[in-house]
Amino acid sequence: MRPYELMVIIDPEVEERTVESSLQKFLNVITTDGGTIEKVDIWGRRRLAYDIKKKSEGIYAVVNFTAAPATAKELDRQLSLNETIMRTKIIRPEDQKVVAE
């Protein structure tokens, strides 16, 4: 299992209060394959740097989770098939080791 961070930009026409419940449908892929969801952080409606699908705003959400690489790939595939998801990005955060001097 590896740690991942997922950032999702959701269509602004979706109501903000339903964002977490609609994301949960996709995040079930992680838990059914044995992964864990550490944190779901809904940033809310933000202005985009450039228009995506003729929209200048989007609802941002960041999810930290642990899963197998195949599970992360499947999650990205399922998110890309949904029309309300404007953009996704899954990254593996670097190990941040602090060296004491």
Curated annotation (Swiss-Prot):
GO CC term, one of those recorded: ribonucleoprotein complex
UniProt keyword annotations, A-Z: Ribonucleoprotein, Ribosomal protein, RNA-binding, rRNA-binding
InterPro entries (UniProt xref): Ribosomal_bS6 (IPR000529), Ribosomal_bS6_CS (IPR020815), Ribosomal_bS6_sf (IPR035980), Ribosomal_S6_plastid/chlpt (IPR020814), Transl_elong_EF1B/ribsomal_bS6 (IPR014717)
A Pfam family annotated for this UniProt entry: Ribosomal_S6
Classification via Gene3D superfamilies: 3.30.70.60
Highest taxon of source: Bacteria
Molecular function in Gene Ontology: small ribosomal subunit rRNA binding; structural constituent of ribosome
Gene Ontology annotations of biological process type: translation
Record's function text: Binds together with bS18 to 16S ribosomal RNA.
Family that this chain belongs to: Belongs to the bacterial ribosomal protein bS6 family.
The protein's name: Small ribosomal subunit protein bS6
Protein encoded by which gene: rpsF
